[in-house]
């Protein structure tokens, strides 16, 4: 406990966010059932709710069903960010994506490029582009484009966001602010000051997303420019990397105890994936199955210090039960 408390008192650092599954305008589960669903029987919402407070006792023939019930019931009521807040937060924490432009060389065909980016204060992606790059020439001829971001590129069930918009050159009066925003995410990008480089802003038209592909909780939706820009970036998500790294390295058993106490699911392992002001997400395992669980905080976290306080409180509650 002492080392856990001491860690959270260290200086803060800003880190890249590690994204989560969401459903448009609803609080639906982020559980990954890529393997679990094949074993667990489909259940009604009513039967799931009846077992939300039950603990699983293994050795019985219906243990798989009990686990599915507990996961489903827990995930449906777990506190989480609204979908548009989640998307705004994930985009703000991301640093690279797939840019799609209209090819000038191969007319009528799309052209894809991996690009680094940073979001400005309004959530618009900023690109540092070279006049020599093919995608720059494409954008100058036709500004319509899209930017695809994966919260975790290695998780095919995870959140995918596509921002459609028009790429425009940043005006002279905005150069300093945009340069600062870009270098804050890419501090080693010294080439942005080269003569052939300039900044372009993708002005959003619509933001689409899909999550939970190949799981029991497939979801998709879209938000207008106004909805997207009105959403706020979660202030706690920036601390995800230092907190999760420390917890996974030094306190995995503590995380597992918290998950078991909150969900009643006797997970065999639990790795913290990310966090926000309302809670954190874990990748858990149980009897050969791997799935995601949402672990809500008892209340909204106010700052980095409060995250420490909440996790310690949750651990103390788990150890007292």
UniProtKB/Swiss-Prot annotation:
GO terms for biological process, alphabetical: heme catabolic process; tetrapyrrole biosynthetic process
Any Gene Ontology CC annotation: chloroplast
EC number: 1.14.-.-
Molecular function as annotated in GO: heme binding; metal ion binding; oxidoreductase activity; protein homodimerization activity
Transit peptide: 1-45
Main location: plastid
Metal-binding in keyword set: yes
Top-rank taxon: Eukaryota
Complex and partners: Homodimer. Binds to heme in the interdimer interface; the heme iron is coordinated by a fixed water molecule.
Protein task: Dimeric beta-barrel protein binding to heme and catalyzing its degradation to produce biliverdin. May function in the tetrapyrrole biosynthetic pathway.
Record-given protein name: Non-canonical heme oxygenase HOZ, chloroplastic
Organism: Arabidopsis thaliana
